[in-house]
């Protein structure tokens, strides 16, 4: 970099190796953080001089008015200017720190528009993570917790995945009985809609082979009618009433700290938590007060918290640029990854299984009317085409009876669509939020849908073809949250084994990048303050070791995140 005499003492030039490996690079430029970092609400620019400038970068701005740039300036928590290296260098004064990016790539901060961040964080602290590749490993992990737990007390595992086990079969209650004959145990699927309960847990709940399935749930049985221990959807309610809360307020705060560290390490700068109660709201506030919340949050209230907010006159959008109230969350059917979503045609190999509904049409109408008339954006979990139709019926009804411009109601997951559904979504101005890492990560599950359905599942290309602002969604823990994996998944439609699912739904890298940034901001009414590297917007950005355009599409997920910056401050950096 040519030194600027005016600020030569503040110039920084780094080789790629040094930039990646040194924590002093951006820290020296005024964007490093102390051990506990506080995200603050936006402050106005106080002077023309930028705090620091980043030069000689490959900036993918995701701003249609200026798609690429070489450099940008940051003042406070905002982008002060974006342009060529020469122009941005000329803005620097003697107090401005100068960073030479040496040709590395910069993107806007990534946004996850559907995640369960706080719950995932605290689960890591209080439950047994069984994201393992064999039943033997799962049993060993559970055994350690059982050994430390008094007889009769519950043991809980989470993040179980039935299709990634070396034994080639799912976990069942008899496996768990072998290591926990005297403790009730539940192992939750990472999809969040099923769990495997051992025999003691079933007995405590009074569940036998003769227990009928509820309309909105299922107790699974083998071919001989014997309970396997797998329980789906609302059939789990009987257990929820028995399992005591196992987390403290401090653990929930620490869970937010942990998950925000993990997610910013992956390049996420904003998350929309779909579904949260009072404890989640307190956890985010506590973590923020402690300086331990590294990303921006939009919380989707549900249940009693939603009722309390309505009674207090709060609506979607209340809050600031760090934490705000988002849409209200409801859930109307089963899971794509657990193969319980409600469809108009059956699952492959299960001719009588169409999936599970968890809300009736009347219940959806009632919930949507209440939320819509109280000024809330709405996000309803609806995976299957049957359920999506039901949700659209409700959205169309309320907009006909009580029109509200630009309501941006959402369909969370919106997994299986059709041309008719796409036309209705477009006409209603609804935002779909399909899984963005599912095709790549959950490939072994798609055989139960088949290629015909997969041509219309997680249909990012079709949404874009219909000019629908499709949002980015991991649903973590059900799907991995890493946005670079999301880019790869949407671009290639390949699973871990290289199988292609629904190749007609492939999109370009630039389209995928926009989904993960600008479309994410649009989904929460924040497109004017973030989602692109644009003058005046929040300085949320990510520095990548390589440009996704330059690597093999099958290797995008392996690109190194060098640094994640939120509001001008470094939240992750080597």
Locate predicted features:
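Signal peptide processing junction and immediate N-terminal pro/mature segment
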Residues: 35-43
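N-terminal secretory signal peptides
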Residues: 1-18, 25-29
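Non-cysteine beta-strand/loop elements that form the S-adenosyl-L-methionine
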Residues: 323-339, 430-438
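Acidic (Asp/Glu)-rich catalytic clusters
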Residues: 288, 316-319, 426-427
């Amino acid at each position: 970099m040519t030194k600027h005499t005016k600020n030569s003492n503040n110039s920084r030039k780094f080789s790629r190796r040094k930039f990646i490996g040194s924590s002093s690079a951006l820290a020296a430029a005024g964007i490093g953080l102390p051990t506990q970092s506080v995200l603050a609400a936006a402050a106005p620019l106080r002077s023309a001089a930028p705090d620091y400038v980043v030069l000689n970068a490959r900036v993918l701005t995701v701003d249609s008015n200026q798609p690429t740039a070489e450099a940008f300036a940051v003042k406070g928590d905002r982008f002060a200017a974006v342009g060529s290296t020469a122009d941005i260098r000329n803005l620097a004064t003697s107090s401005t720190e100068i960073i030479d990016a040496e040709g590395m790539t910069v993107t806007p901060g990534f946004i996850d528009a559907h995640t369960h961040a706080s719950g995932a964080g605290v689960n890591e602290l209080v439950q047994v993570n069984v994201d393992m590749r064999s039943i033997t490993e799962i049993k060993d992990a559970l055994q350690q917790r059982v050994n430390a737990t008094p007889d009769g007390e519950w043991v809980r595992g989470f993040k179980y995945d039935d299709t990634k086990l070396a034994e080639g079969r799912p976990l069942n209650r008899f496996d768990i009985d072998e290591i926990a004959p005297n403790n009730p145990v539940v192992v939750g699927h990472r999809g969040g809609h099923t769990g495997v309960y051992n025999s003691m847990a079933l007995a405590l709940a009074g569940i036998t082979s003769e227990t009928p399935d509820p309309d909105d749930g299922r107790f699974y049985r083998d071919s001989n009618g014997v309970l396997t221990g797998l329980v789906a959807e609302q059939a789990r309610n009987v257990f929820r009433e028995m399992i005591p809360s196992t987390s403290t307020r401090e653990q929930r705060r620490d869970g937010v700290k942990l998950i925000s560290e993990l997610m910013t390490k992956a390049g996420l700068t904003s998350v929309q938590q779909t579904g949260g109660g009072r404890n989640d709201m307190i956890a985010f506030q506590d973590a923020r007060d402690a300086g331990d919340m590294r990303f921006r949050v939009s919380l989707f209230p549900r249940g009693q918290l939603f009722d309390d907010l309505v009674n207090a006159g709060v609506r979607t959008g209340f809050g600031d640029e760090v934490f705000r109230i988002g849409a209200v969350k409801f859930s109307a059917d089963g899971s794509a990854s657990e193969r319980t979503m409600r469809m108009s045609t059956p699952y492959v190999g299960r001719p009588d299984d169409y999936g599970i509904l968890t809300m009736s049409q009347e219940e959806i109408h009632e919930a949507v009317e209440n939320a819509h008339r109280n000024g809330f954006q709405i996000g309803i979990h609806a995976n299957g085409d049957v359920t999506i139709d039901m949700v659209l019926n409700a959205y169309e009804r309320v907009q006909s009876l009580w029109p509200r411009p630009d309501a941006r109601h959402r369909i969370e997951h919106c997994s299986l669509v059709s041309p008719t559904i796409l036309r209705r979504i477009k006409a209603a101005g609804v935002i779909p939020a399909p899984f963005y890492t599912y095709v790549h990560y959950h490939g072994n599950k798609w055989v139960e849908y088949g290629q015909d359905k997969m041509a219309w599942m997680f249909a990012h290309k079709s949404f874009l073809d219909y000019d629908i602002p499709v949002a980015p969604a991991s649903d973590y823990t059900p799907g991995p949250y890493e946005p670079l994996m999301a880019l790869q998944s949407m671009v290639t439609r390949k699973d871990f084994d290289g199988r292609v699912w629904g190749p007609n739904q492939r999109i370009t890298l630039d389209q995928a990048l926009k989904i993960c940034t600008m479309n994410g901001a649009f989904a929460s009414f924040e497109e004017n303050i973030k989602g692109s590297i644009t003058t005046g917007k929040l300085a949320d950005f990510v520095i990548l070791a390589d440009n996704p355009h330059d690597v093999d599409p099958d290797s995008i997920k392996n690109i190194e995140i060098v640094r994640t910056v939120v509001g001008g401050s470094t939240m992750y950096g080597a």
